[in-house]
Amino acid sequence: GVSNAADIKLEVLTTDTEGAKKQAEVLQEQFQKNLGITVEIKQVTYKQRLEMEQTKEYDMVVTGWVPDYSDAYSYLELWISDGQYNHSGYNNPRYDELLEASQFETDAAKRQDMLFEAEQIFLGEDSALVPLQLRREQYLVNPKLENFNVYFVGYDFNLVYADLAE
């Protein structure tokens, strides 16, 4: 163990954008202020960050995900032990079992319970990830624009069914 938090030094990996830098600086400040832990910021290109994630060359990494469809599975599948996007090395057999079983469960309530249990394991018991933000957008829309739908996941909006009233 470590007897003094000041002896802990971590590096946070992020992309080389101004927004990513500001986010990493907030993390750096909070770790120092609340835990006494020193955090260095390492900014690299997006491509380099992805490569470093895949090879697990980081202590902490700031990354993001926008789900492909409106279902909890679209988030949770990222952390299946042998999953293509599991760049953390996270591994929990019970989590994997729940995700696998949820794919074949036809009772929507039971499936939701399975996914909720998996989420509790991942975020609660194992604390494998710390959500930092939820992306939301604001839109000012002309009242004459009908059937304009804003989506929570994936693309922000789709104009396929939109129509401008007379």
Regions found by a protein language model. Name each.
Residues 26-41:
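Short alpha-helix C-terminal cap/hinge motif
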Residues 14-15, 35-37, 85-86:
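Short, contiguous strand/loop micro-motifs
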Residues 1-5:
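Surface-exposed acidic, glycine-flexible loop patches that form ligand/cofactor-binding
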Residues 7-16, 39-42, 59:
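Short, well-ordered beta-strand elements
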Residues 10, 41-51, 137:
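Acidic/histidine-enriched alpha-helical segments
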